[in-house]
Amino acid sequence: MKHPLFTSLALVTALTASAYAQTITPTRVGPVSQYGQLMTGKNSQGKGQIYGSCEGVKDGAEVQVRGMSLYWSLMPEAMEFWTEEGITTMVNDMNIQIVRAAMATKASDDWKGEWNGIQLKGWEGDKTNQTNFVKTVVEAAIKNDIYVIIDWHSHSAHEQTNSAKEFFTEMAKQYGQYDNVIFEVYNEPQQIQWSAVKNYANEVIAAIRQYSDNLVLVGNPSWDQNPSDAIGNEVTDSKKNTAYTLHYYANSHCWQGSYGWGDGNNDACEGTKGEKAMNAGLSVFISEWGTGNSDGGGTPDQSRNQSWQEYANKHKLSWANWSASMIKEGTAAFQSGSSKTSLQYTTSGNLVKGYLSTNPKSYTACKANVPESSSSVVAIPFFQNNDRFNVSFANGKLALESTASGTTKIEVFDLLGHTRMQKEDVFASGSHMIDISTLPAGRYLARVRQGVNVRQLRFEVR
């Protein structure tokens, strides 16, 4: 007889990883254990924000995480930190909550750099090594229980649609069931139309959604300075979990008001356009920002940096600082002579480390309220999203208790991320039982959605 049995939280967290990768278990309780999967939503005023699946979409539960962006994976002065030791050192010494893996993409991305005997070229010129660089960072982030952005670091991704789909399909298949992972499908579009970005993003997001409902980040025209371009013309996302990026460099860009050029929306400050997008209900994410000039140079202006930090904190905007590298640029965080186990900070690095010092020093794992039951069917409710409905197991069936009627989608996934059962229907309020006795022995993830409300449980059938 098959019995879904209770398993430990550490185990079930790891079970949703794809079988393509070794099971990865966190070595500590960090921000991912506390907040869960990052997800978009609106507050009671209709403002777009980022939330965590543990508390769900509600006022006061907005999530802001802050950390570092690795430099483009083309320079040996950067690759020292594309390592497990490099990520762990930044967690311990800088208190980062998130890291961004800015992967070079084009075959023509070749700056003649060499690291550990590898000629550094973009993904289209060296799929194996670039993919492995990203995997190393992702797995280090999971072990450290921090978030990780997988960044297709391109200025012309709309010309690389098939390559991006291939890459993100592999990443979603392998890591898409880890709450740590965020997919950034287009780093910085240049001066092209939003429609070109949107059409590209629609295709890549669809590829990701075959295997993962994790947060997706989408860039926008003029180097991610126009998230408001997407208002009323958002990308298509079956999981409704896409945010729009805002990039800024403190010496060059302004956080409020306008430049005074008298050119309509093009005149508005980058921060103003970000706020406009949020007020229209779009979630915004600062996946890259620098302390200096927009070209990466310059000495950080302390006052302008402080104003931008106040802007980000006011709007609960998550960010990754450019860059965790020893590149000879004013925005590089580390001095020459630093290593993956020992960091010596530049002016920029010390400034950013100061901001990161206010991140929490400890975290509490999301509560797993395991109900007492004489039934052999018991599992952990992993996503504590709201009080509108509850999900449990009883007598070989999934039990749904709902206080409201509405369209409800029930999905059960195996370890590969394949859908093993799916049901979508309009359920009235009250109790409903869904038979799962046909599932073979194995480990599964059950997810139940009513609109933006989510419950998720991980269980094992023996």
Regions found by a protein language model. Name each.
Residues 1-9:
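Bacterial N-terminal signal peptides that target proteins for export
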Residues 8-16:
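Bacterial N-terminal signal peptides
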Residues 17-21:
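Sec/Tat signal peptide C-region and signal peptidase I cleavage site
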Residues 22-27, 359-386:
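Low-complexity, Pro/Thr/Ser/Gly/Ala-rich linker/spacer regions in secreted
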Residues 24-114:
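N-terminal structural segment of carbohydrate-active enzymes
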Residues 27-48, 67, 72, 79, ...:
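Extracellular glycoside hydrolase catalytic/binding regions
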Residues 82-155, 163-166, 208-209, 301-315:
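Aromatic-lined substrate-binding rim segments of carbohydrate-active enzymes
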Residues 379-462:
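C-terminal outer-membrane/trafficking sorting elements
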